[in-house]
């Protein structure tokens, strides 16, 4: 069997490229959502956006972070008006991140924040880092 070099090269390229294309399709989507308003309606919108993204793409196909800083940190407190929604978000593997700069400046202790919330040194910087890493950015 005599296969011309061009056909052999084309088959080789196809064999190597096909698995790579499959891996690209399976790559997880990543989105970081900013909430910097002390407004239950904005928080509800952000949480709804996160759940809708999971519903559309599949929970296993997307990483979601909601970063709260400035006045938005108030909604991450244990007694906030959206505390029940925070619990549902955490249960759905949505990462809730509180800005420690805001906490320090407003004298909020980690014990004041809803259980399951994680902490980042600086919310704005964390969002910038995620954008550099290729994460999609939303601000409802």
List PLM regions with ranges.
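N-terminal secretory signal peptides and thylakoid transit peptides that target proteins
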Residues: 1-15
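Secreted/extracellular ectodomain signature
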Residues: 21-140
